[in-house]
Amino acid sequence: MAVGKNKRLSKGKKGLKKKVVDPFTRKEWYDIKAPSTFENRNVGKTLVNKSTGLKNAADFLKGRVVEVCLADLQGSEDHSFRKVKLRVDEVQGKNLLTNFHGLDFTTDKLRSMVRKWQTLIEANVTVKTADDYVLRVFAIAFTRRQSNQIKKTSYAQSSHIRAIRKVISEILTREVQNATLAQLTSKLIPEVINKEIENATKDIFPLQNVHIRKVKLLKQPKFDLGALMTLHGESSGEEKGKKVAGGFKDEILETV
C-alpha cells in the first residue's frame, strides 16, 4: 500500500474570500486648467496613480489630451457644437497647465448643415504660426440663394468653387501665419475668420454656414515653460534683479 497524503483530509477550506483592495486608494486627483484665452479655466479633474519609487505621476500626466465642449469653457450654449482639445504640458502641484491642441465640430452639427439645393465647398491649408506651431486648418461653406433669385436651387459652377476655394485658402494662410497660437485661438472662438471669408467671397457667390470646422496640430516647437506660464497669466517663477536708483559708493575710513 502506498503511503502518502490523504487528499480528502488535506483539502483547504472553501469559501474564504480574498481581501478586496479599492483601486482608487492608489490614485489621486489633479485639476485641469485651461489657458487664459478661455472664459472658464477650470476644465475638470483627472485621475492618475500616485508616485511610487521610480514611477513619477507627472510623467504619466504630461502629454495627456482631454476633449472639452467649447460651451463649457465659454459659458455660452452658442458654442455647444464645437469641441476643443487641450494637451497637458506642465504639472504644478495639483494643477495641470494645458495648451491648445485642436478644434473639431460635433457630428450632428455637420450633418444638419448638409441640405438639398446647395453646393458644399471645402478647403484646407497646412500653415506654420508665428510661434512655430504647424497646423492644418479645415474650412467648410455652403452656397445660398441670392436675394432676387426665383430658382429654388443655388448650385455653384466649378469655376466659382475653384475661385472660392482659392480665396478661403489665402485668408486662412494669412491669418495663421501672422498670429501666434494664442492669438489664433482668440480669433477662432468668436468666428472672426468666418465672417471675413463670407465678405470676401460675396462677389463670387453668396455663402452661408461658413465655419472653421477643424484645426489639427501637426507639429509643435520645443517646450517653453515661460511661454506656457504667460499663456496661463502667471509668471515663470524666475527672479530678476531690480536696478537700484542712484550709485553706490564705498565709504573710506580715514582713521582706524
Curated annotation (Swiss-Prot):
Q: Which residues carry this modification: N-acetylalanine?
A: 2
Which keywords belong to this entry?
Acetylation, Cytoplasm, Ribonucleoprotein, Ribosomal protein
Note the InterPro entries from the entry.
Ribosomal_eS1, Ribosomal_eS1_CS, Ribosomal_eS1_euk
Record's superkingdom?
Eukaryota
Which cysteine pairs are covalently linked by disulfides here? Answer: none
Question: Can you name a GO cellular component term?
Answer: cytosol
Tell me, what is an example of a GO biological process annotation in this record? translation
> How does this protein assemble?
Component of the small ribosomal subunit. Mature ribosomes consist of a small (40S) and a large (60S) subunit. The 40S subunit contains about 33 different proteins and 1 molecule of RNA (18S). The 60S subunit contains about 49 different proteins and 3 molecules of RNA (25S, 5.8S and 5S).
State the family it belongs to: Belongs to the eukaryotic ribosomal protein eS1 family.
* Name of the protein this chain belongs to: Small ribosomal subunit protein eS1
Q: Which gene encodes it?
A: RPS1
